[in-house]
Each structure stands twice: as structure tokens, then as C-alpha cells.
Amino acid sequence: MNVKEAIRERRSIRDFKSDKVKKEDLDLILEAARLAPSGTNLQPWRFVVVESDEMREKLRGCTLDFVGDAPVTIVCCVDYKALEEMNDRLKELQEVGALKGTALEKIDPSKYKGRKMSEEDIKRYLHLNLSIAIENMALQATELGLGSCWLMMFNEKKLSQILNLDDNLEAVALLPIGYGSDNPAPRPRLSLDRIVIDRV
């Protein structure tokens, strides 16, 4: 399956079989997240893999029931401490020549502060970066014949307590993964004419 096929075949699966996900498949899915691009190569994503029956049952108490039916759920978090490593990430990009020809090519990484952002902007920035990693995982799962469902409907405070997340971590999304009980039809999508505002 190529990327185009994975994009076309991916569906949000809400009815999972009880079959376990193979460890090697789960590792490939997590590796797809690890390889995702991010602003300044910040890589602010952190993941908690929920597989045990006990923890899956606890998940039901803070999100939709079907999440507990999935054999594995990846809790997708952002790490606000990642911002403290921005200078290190910038230096790495300089060392591999990724910033050649840009204003950041010769800047002193130790003095780089990035653009000034409000707390809301920082949150949005980290969430957007995490989103890329989540979609990578969803597409990798599809290629492996697995279903997933990216959702943000959960009680964040309760989930953080259940998982004992550090204060610097924010759970942003859940990605239950498993073998779908059925093969749902393609969902309706808007036409290109509706979504492309202009070509200038």
C-alpha cells in the first residue's frame, strides 16, 4: 500500500475486534510518530501506550466506551518542557545543514529565543506539531491493516490522574488502535471546489 492508498483507505474505526495488536506493528506505528516533522525539529510529542485490561477499563471512565474495547490506545501528549530544548534542536538542524540559505543558518543557537508567543499561541503550536505525528500513526496503522480513531472527547483531568502524568505533559488526543469489526464505506468529503478558496 502506498501513501495515496493509505490516505484513501483510512477510516475512523469505532468497533474493534478483541484481537491483540502485534508488538512489531505497534512499534512501527510509534516509529511513524517519531519520524514526523515538527517546527524547529522540536518533537514535543510524548505517548502513553495503554494495553492492559485494567487500564483500558479505566479509560472507559473518562472517554467514549468504545475506546476501552480497542486492544491498544495511544494517549497522545505534548511536553511543554520540550520548549526548553529549542536551542539544542536548532543546533542539530544547523549541524546537518537543514537550515542552509535561511536566516537561521548562522544564528547562535544559544541566543535563539524563537518568535514571541503568548501561552495560547504556544499551546496551539505544540498541538499542531503533535497532530502531524498522530496522522502519521493513523496512516501507518492503515497500511498494516489496522483501524484507528483519532478523538479528543475525554476528561483530561481524570485521564491525567489515571495515568499519573507529570505537570509538564498535556494529554491532547486518544488514538485507539485495533482490527475493525467491519469495513466502513468512505465518508463524504467536500469537493476541491469547496475547499480551495483561490489559486493566485
What is each PLM-predicted segment?
Residues 1-200:
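Acidic, surface-exposed loops and disordered segments
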